[in-house]
A protein has these predicted regions:
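Conserved HGGG/HGGXW glycine-rich cap/lid loop of the alpha/beta-hydrolase fold
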Residues: 7-59
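Active-site loop/oxyanion-hole signature of alpha/beta-hydrolase fold enzymes
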Residues: 49-87
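Gly/Ala-rich beta-loop-alpha elbow adjacent to hydrolase catalytic centers
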Residues: 88-92, 96
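Flexible "cap/lid" loop of the alpha/beta hydrolase fold
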Residues: 101, 109-142
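Conserved alpha/beta-hydrolase catalytic His-Asp/Glu region
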Residues: 122-123, 144-202
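Short beta-strand/loop motif that positions the catalytic acidic residue
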Residues: 203, 211-213, 217
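Conserved alpha/beta-hydrolase "acid-adjacent" motif
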Residues: 218-224
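Catalytic histidine-centered segment of alpha/beta-hydrolase-like enzymes
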Residues: 243-256
Length: 268
């Protein structure tokens, strides 16, 4: 039996504003994915950064990293914060939806950045095996993903800052802060098998939804997000021309401006 009492997600707090904004990173991400860019936001609001279970400085138990388990751990960390705006990137965006659907009275706003949505596990496999994503087929084989995780963490991890020059050094360094179990289980349970569209429909009409997505995102296809946004009442889609899967890393000022406007009630 797992001791839930022994689990405690790593959480960082910045600023002391009236509004609280919680940032959830994607697969392999940590608080350092956000920390370089949230300074201006923390001058006006209380900003909370969290490492998901199995990643970063949070515990990494041998468990099934299901949507329900992730949400339960987030609830233990966030329940005392009162009303919040949830900002999630990639897998973190999917978990933000899941959390909001189960805590509709707490989550006032949702910001979904680079969120992957395929509709089903089979559709995800078809897309990743289509050749549109470099080495995409690898992410559809749990054994290959497991081997890649082990080799990266134990052998080649020190090379990541030199290989992944498209992202900040600290973000690349933290890509090894997980286990093969937390990585593979989260990928399959959350990205491939979770029905985000159905959960979006469960949200309160008062929940404001902001989607920020790069039009050149090959990991999370833009067309699927465009369709979701069109079907979801009260949602706004910010289309970023020429950007990939990491809008917050490429243009943090743009992302922060939209987030601040949403939280402050300044959206047109």
């Amino acid at each position: 039996m797992e001791s839930k009492e022994s689990q405690s997600l790593h959480v960082e707090y910045y600023g002391e504003g009236e509004k609280t904004i919680v940032f959830i990173p994607g697969l392999g991400g940590t608080t350092r994915y956000w920390s370089h860019g949230i300074g201006p936001l923390a001058e006006r609001h209380r900003v909370v950064l969290v490492d998901l279970l199995g990643f970063g400085a949070s515990p990494k138990p041998w468990t099934r990293y299901s949507v329900e388990r992730h949400v339960a751990e987030l609830d233990a960390a966030l329940a005392s914060l009162g009303a919040i705006t949830l900002v999630g990137h990639s897998l973190g965006a999917l978990l933000a939806i899941a959390y909001a659907a189960r805590h509709r009275n707490q989550v006032e706003n949702l910001v979904l950045i680079g969120m992957p949505y395929f509709g089903s596990e089979e559709a995800a496999y078809r897309y990743l095996r289509s050749g549109k994503v470099k080495w995409g087929f690898l992410y559809t084989n749990v054994l290959l993903v497991m081997i890649a995780c082990i080799l990266t963490r134990r052998v080649f991890g020190w090379l990541l800052p030199y290989v992944r020059r498209d992202i900040p050094r600290e973000v690349a360094e933290d890509l090894v802060k997980h286990t093969w179990r937390s990585s593979t289980s989260s990928l399959w349970e959350v990205v491939y098998r979770y029905d985000a569209a159905n959960e979006l429909r469960r949200l309160s009409e008062q929940t404001q939804i902001l989607m920020i997505h790069g039009q050149d995102d090959d990991i999370a296809p833009f067309a699927a997000i465009k369709q979701l946004a069109d079907e979801q009442p009260g949602s706004t889609l910010i289309e970023l021309d020429g950007l990939d899967h990491h809008p917050f890393l490429r243009t943090p000022h743009t992302c922060l401006t939209h987030i601040d406007s949403l939280v402050s009630g300044d959206r047109p």
